[in-house]
Amino acid sequence: AKSTELLFLNDTDWQAFADAADVRCEDLATMEGLTAAAEKYYNWTDAQTAAPDDGKALFGRDAMANYMLVGAQQLGDTIFAVKDGRMTVNFERDVARRLWDNYYVPFVRGWFAATGRFRSDDIKTGNVLAYVGSSSSATFFPARVTNDANESHEISLKTLPAPQFEGGEAVAVQQGAGMVVTAAKEKEVKASVEFLKWFVRAENNIAFSVGSGYLPVTRKANDMQEILASGLTLDDNMQQTLTVAVDTVNGNRLYTPHAFAGGSSARKVLEYGLSDLAAADRETVEQRIAEGQSAAEAEAEFLTDEYFEVWYQDICAKLAQYEG
């Protein structure tokens, strides 16, 4: 079973903002457009209260390593360049800056957020209106929002393609679960192979994959007509999610990093190296605002070229430890 990443939107609350601020779903097609929309949402929500600098975040993200790896691919970099099982870091400064400017900067300024364990949790509490996550996470999208005041209302889901970097190559992540045949008696290996052949037949793989919220593993089965013809019952959320997911798989170059020694640990550097810093610095900004500083004063230290450079050198040094 396979999956990719999509953008999941609380369309109910988005519509009120979109109408008031003259923004559209099309604005969320690029990371730059998403960042600009998030700034507008922060300002729009900030203006609804008398307190200064208390706007809300529009967006959050699961799987930060995917943001880094796939975003770099879109911009022409392969961060983990692997040959013969050995990895070389290839993380150009200008690519790193685009990633920084479209995650760290909006996060520190309160336009992006990550509070719950998963971003679908942040949708449920109203902390964000949209998130990028696995296509399989559609089953976890909440039907209601309940805020800190215990006020609750129903919401509807709109599924969109994951935003990509403006002017970059169309690249999407490929991920999911696989199977292997382990060493065994010849008869057992042959039986395992026969099972796998049966399992990946379109009719069987569609039933298993789609029924569990994933995508089929063959090109033939990754077709909405094939999926609809399978007879599976799909609710509106799953049908729109599968439609966008299938379009994503068929309309992008799919990317997954090659394996190398220490690859899991190196991936963790990308998973947490930007997001943890952003969360810690946003907390500092909020403390400073609570003490009376303006948002501009509280954020200034973190928005300099020098601050980016320190992070860039640090993450490159950490990644270099896993080079072959």
Language-model features and meaning:
Residues 35-42, 82-116, 162:
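Glycine-centered hinge/linker elements that transmit conformational signals in sensory
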Residues 1-5, 15, 32-88:
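Extracytoplasmic/periplasmic solute-binding protein
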Residues 129-134, 139-141:
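Paired acidic/hydrophobic, glycine-rich loop segments that form the ligand-binding mouth/hinge
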Residues 24-26, 77-98, 147-152, 164-170, ...:
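Short, solvent-exposed loop/beta-turn-alpha elements that line the ligand-binding surface or hinge
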Residues 246-324:
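Conserved C-terminal helix/tail region of periplasmic/extracytoplasmic solute-binding proteins
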Residues 1-6, 15, 154-163:
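Hinge/lid segment of periplasmic solute-binding proteins
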Residues 33-40, 117-131, 276-279:
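Short helices/loops that flank or line small-molecule/ion binding pockets
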Residues 108-109, 147-220, 253:
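Extracytoplasmic/periplasmic substrate-recognition and gating elements
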